[in-house]
């Protein structure tokens, strides 16, 4: 996974006394030791990753440490969404305790969103808070889950229902890590990139329409631009509403209320990746907005067309979901955004004009989810 080292772009996350920065650049893995050492008081590194990343990327990562004379310890977990569980959380905490982890050691989450969420939550609760570093290796993690401090595991009732806000001390993003990703994982990550255009940036969505296919196919310039743009967009929102108090950060949940219900129906498994669920969920959010005479027919047609062109699901059928509207709404009842018995939804008045609606009728949602538009993307 070697490459020439490119110019490093730094994006600050301004959160007062727990602010941090994100470094983005091709070839940064080659400089990992020198970049990370300032964040570790006693120069002890513990890398936590999954079986897939361990096979493809861990050897080179460890090599850079060994060549610098720095010891690095590794913990390898199973790959897949099922790893975000009580069982694996307890097992990871036990392993870290047995290895004598200290609060100021560098616990490194090297992997995709699953590893980042699990390791971040373990760091949040272990010894009442250990520092950790995010090194995301999937496109989804690089543009979304590694930024903002949300950490969590899943449970039987739903996705990410058990967790904490716990910010990393640093995030290192090397786009070259994406070279070993399967095409489906890249498409899933792209599902989160599109979201930023749909929320409040119609020009960026237009850019996605023009460059999305090239990004997925491996165009380095497009990837670097999309990663930086997405991170800057999220950084502004997180700095303004870190813990979803004012409601602004809730905008980042576009597609997620529908999407999490789809993931629940497919058992939080690799049958439907998170980014795929968000893509389908975004189409559903705009579809419902169209039904409510908020968004135009042209907008929903553009979204469905682009999702299909980039290999992402734009309907329940394409996502492999057969549950009825009522069954999907039942999954939504455990949503974290539930407030006073009502579930807010991210809807839109057009591309780039998303808003939070706290007065949505769930019976109307259920009926919409049984419609041809939701089922087949037919409009």
From Swiss-Prot:
Transmembrane feature ranges: none
Keyword Amino-acid biosynthesis applies: yes
Pathway linked to the protein: Metabolic intermediate biosynthesis; chorismate biosynthesis; chorismate from D-erythrose 4-phosphate and phosphoenolpyruvate: step 2/7
Keywords noted in UniProt: Amino-acid biosynthesis, Aromatic amino acid biosynthesis, Cobalt, Cytoplasm, Lyase, Metal-binding, NAD, Nucleotide-binding, Zinc
UniProt subcellular location: Cytoplasm
Domain of life: Bacteria
Chief site of localization: cytoplasm
Catalytic activity, reaction form: 7-phospho-2-dehydro-3-deoxy-D-arabino-heptonate = 3-dehydroquinate + phosphate
Example of a GO biological process term: amino acid biosynthetic process
Amino acids binding NAD(+): 113-117, 137-138, 150, 159
Cofactor(s) this protein cannot do without: Co(2+); Zn(2+); NAD(+)
GO molecular function, one term: metal ion binding
UniProt cross-references to InterPro entries, sorted A to Z: Dehydroquinate_synthase, DHQ_synth_AroB, DHQ_synth_fam, DHQS/DOIS_N, DHQS_C
Catalytic activity, EC: 4.2.3.4
Annotated Gene Ontology cellular component terms: cytoplasm
Cofactor note: Binds 1 divalent metal cation per subunit. Can use either Co(2+) or Zn(2+).
Positions with a binding annotation for Zn(2+): 192, 256, 274
Entry function: Catalyzes the conversion of 3-deoxy-D-arabino-heptulosonate 7-phosphate (DAHP) to dehydroquinate (DHQ).
Family statement drawn from the similarity comment of this UniProt entry: Belongs to the sugar phosphate cyclases superfamily. Dehydroquinate synthase family.
Protein name: 3-dehydroquinate synthase
Species of origin: Zymomonas mobilis subsp. mobilis (strain ATCC 31821 / ZM4 / CP4)
Organism placement in taxonomy: Bacteria, Pseudomonadati, Pseudomonadota, Alphaproteobacteria, Sphingomonadales
């Amino acid at each position: 996974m070697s490459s020439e080292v490119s110019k490093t772009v730094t994006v600050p996350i301004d959160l007062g006394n727990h602010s941090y920065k994100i470094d983005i650049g091709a070839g940064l893995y080659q400089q990992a030791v020198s970049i990370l050492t300032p964040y570790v008081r006693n120069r002890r590194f513990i890398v936590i990753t999954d079986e897939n990343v361990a096979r493809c990327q861990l050897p080179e990562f460890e090599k850079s440490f060994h060549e610098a004379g720095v010891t690095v310890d590794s913990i390898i977990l199973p790959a897949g969404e099922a790893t975000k569980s009580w069982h694996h959380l307890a097992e990871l905490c036990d392993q870290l305790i047995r290895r004598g982890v200290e609060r100021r050691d560098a616990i490194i989450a090297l992997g995709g969103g699953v590893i980042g969420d699990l390791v971040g939550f373990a760091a949040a609760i272990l010894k009442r808070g250990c520092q950790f570093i995010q090194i995301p290796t999937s496109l989804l993690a690089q543009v979304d889950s590694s930024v903002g401090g949300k950490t969590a595991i899943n449970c039987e009732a739903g996705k990410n229902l058990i967790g904490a806000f716990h910010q990393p001390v640093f995030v290192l993003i090397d786009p070259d890590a994406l070279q070993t990703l399967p095409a489906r994982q890249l498409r899933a990550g792209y599902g989160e990139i599109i979201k930023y255009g749909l929320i409040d940036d119609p020009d960026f969505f237009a850019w996605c329409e023009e460059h999305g296919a090239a990004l997925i196919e491996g165009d380095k310039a497009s990837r670097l631009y999309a990663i930086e743009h997405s991170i800057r967009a999220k950084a502004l929102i997180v700095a303004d509403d870190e813990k979803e108090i004012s409601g602004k950060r809730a905008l980042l949940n576009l597609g997620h209320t529908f999407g999490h219900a789809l993931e629940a129906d497919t058992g939080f498994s690799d049958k439907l990746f998170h980014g795929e669920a968000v893509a389908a969920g975004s189409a559903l959010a705009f579809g419902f907005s169209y039904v409510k005479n908020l968004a135009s027919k042209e907008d929903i047609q553009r979204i469905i067309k682009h999702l299909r062109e980039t290999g992402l699901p734009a309907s329940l059928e394409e996502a492999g979901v057969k549950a009825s509207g009522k069954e999907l709404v039942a999954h939504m009842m455990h949503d974290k955004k539930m407030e006073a018995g009502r579930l807010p939804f991210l809807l839109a008045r057009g591309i780039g004009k998303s808003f939070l609606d706290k007065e949505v009728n769930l019976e109307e949602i259920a009926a919409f989810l049984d419609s041809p538009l939701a089922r087949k993307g037919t409009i």
